[in-house]
Amino acid sequence: MEDSRETSPSSNNSSEELSSTLQLSKGMSIFLDILRRADKNDDGKLSFEEFKAYFADGVLSGEELHELFHTIDTHNTNNLDTEELCEYFSQHLGEYENVLAALEDLNLSILKAMGKTKKDYQEASNLEQFVTRFLLKETLNQLQSLQNSLECAMETTEEQTRQERQGPSKPEVLSIQWPGKRSSRRVQRHNSFSPNSPQFNVSSPALLEEDNQWMTQINRLQKLIDRLEKKDLKLEPLEEEIIEENTKPHIMLVQRQMSVTEEDLEEFQLALKHYVESASAQSGCLRISIQKLSNESRYMIYEFWENSSVWNRHLQTNYSKTFQRSNVDFLETPELTSTMLVPASWWILNNN
């Protein structure tokens, strides 16, 4: 299915110029894709803020990211283009040069196979359809197995780096202001052929809590956050809560607001489903609740964690990073996240 969304002439010209002027070696086309995804204002180059939003990994500090940016910026323009990205990373690929080349071939082969499947599947015999479904499933299993191995390698290398760093500086907190809504230009998606699987339903009991008492508490916390932001709250405690020495006095509440583009809503819902399933399985996660605002593609996600340390460890997990990375494409504007500590007694009271 062709993408009917309009793209700006400058974006098309920029892509054509890059393809024609750059003689990319095998496997380096990934950097064209990186530039398209990270370039939020579609000017064909990356500012430092765009670079930071895409490349920050939670290990390098802001100063280190800034130093890396200027190392790559050999043209000294305070912007990065595809040529500079390719020139820098091509010097450090090692064995991954072969990996990227193989991925490029694999991507083309899969797209070709899926295109033929889309064309021939409907008219195929029952046996041929079975074989097609089987091959799709087994191909997916093989790719997922490779993904699991890569995720283990990522976790190991990141943990090793953290342990080796003496007096680690505070990881860079991502914060980038995008002007208005996202540009309509997207990375070209090859997902026109997909199985008719049941659509992810955010109103399912596992994800959208309809318990009135619970939602009342969430609304109460929302009002409290709003009042705190207005700075007109006068704290006059009517009751003093006595906390025992070994009792954990607070838990962490995380509120996340996400405005999703209409065309990416289904993919976002699937990514959100996987994220919630993974996060909910963590021992420090007390509860996750989701609200979708009516008549809007805006989601409010409330996460309750045992403490801030558990929450910070959660942010470094692969499933959390995968969800954040996918949101680069799915969200119209940057995600808004706010955190606050709430009395642990509230949680105990509402779960007894």
UniProtKB/Swiss-Prot annotation:
Xref: InterPro entries: ABM_dom, Dimeric_a/b-barrel, EF-hand-dom_pair, EF_Hand_1_Ca_BS, EF_hand_dom, NECAB1/2/3
Domain ABM: 252-340
Xref: PROSITE patterns: ABM, EF_HAND_1, EF_HAND_2
Signal peptide: none
Residues holding Ca(2+): D39, N41, D43, K45, E50
GO biological process: blastocyst hatching
Coiled coil: 135-163, 209-275
Domain EF-hand residues, every copy: 26-61, 60-95
Membrane spanning stretches: none
Region (Disordered): 155-202
Tissues showing expression: Expressed in brain (at protein level). Expressed in the cerebral cortex only in layer 4, thalamic nuclei (the mediodorsal nucleus), hippocampus (a small band of pyramidal neurons at the boundary between CA1 and CA3), interneurons interspersed throughout the hippocampus proper, interneurons in the hilus, bodies of the neurons but also their dendritic projections (at protein level).
GO cellular component, one term: nucleoplasm
Pfam families reported for this sequence: ABM
Subcellular location: Cytoplasm
Keywords on record: Calcium, Coiled coil, Cytoplasm, Metal-binding, Phosphoprotein, Repeat
Domain of life, per lineage: Eukaryota
Modification Phosphoserine occurs at: S4, S192, S197
Extent of Polar residues compositional bias: 190-202
Gene Ontology MF terms: calcium ion binding; identical protein binding
Subunit structure: Interacts with STX1. May interact with CPNE6.
Name of this protein: N-terminal EF-hand calcium-binding protein 1
Source taxonomy: Eukaryota, Metazoa, Chordata, Craniata, Vertebrata
